[in-house]
């Protein structure tokens, strides 16, 4: 498996990972991974977007992940399984909006 990497590469991996697992619960969920400002090079703030809304909605804090934690553990199946469970729980908690399937078959 793979671990480590530059901040931008790890952010891209995290965005894809969050999208993949969120969409298993809600096909309209989109990942929002905050990497700017004081987070840049240090950490990631993860939220899910459904339409115009974010979850967790500000002022509630996003799911916080440190860059070293993600970079070091993204190759660990156990760590990824735990993160996937957290992301899927966020997606299940998204408020219902719009129409269409919320889950994959």
Give the label of every model feature segment.
Residues 1-37, 73-87, 105:
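Negatively charged, low-complexity tracts enriched in Asp/Glu with abundant Ser/Thr
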Residues 34, 47-49:
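Residue-level recognition of well-ordered beta-strand positions that form the cores
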Residues 38-46:
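A short, glycine/Asx- and small/polar-enriched loop/turn
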Residues 50-85, 89-92:
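Intrinsically disordered, low-complexity regulatory segments enriched in Ser/Thr/Pro
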Residues 92, 96-105:
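Intrinsically disordered, low-complexity, Lys/Arg-biased terminal tails
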């Amino acid at each position: 498996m793979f671990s480590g990497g530059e901040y931008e590469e790890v952010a891209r991996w995290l965005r894809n990972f969050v999208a993949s697992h969120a969409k298993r619960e809600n096909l309209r969920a989109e990942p929002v991974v905050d990497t700017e400002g004081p987070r840049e090079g240090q950490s990631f703030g993860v939220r899910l977007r459904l339409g115009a809304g974010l979850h967790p909605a500000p002022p509630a804090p996003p799911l916080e992940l440190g860059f070293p934690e993600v970079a070091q553990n993204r190759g660990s199946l156990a760590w990824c399984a735990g993160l996937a469970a957290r992301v899927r729980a966020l997606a299940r908690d998204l408020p219902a909006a719009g129409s269409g399937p919320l889950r994959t078959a």
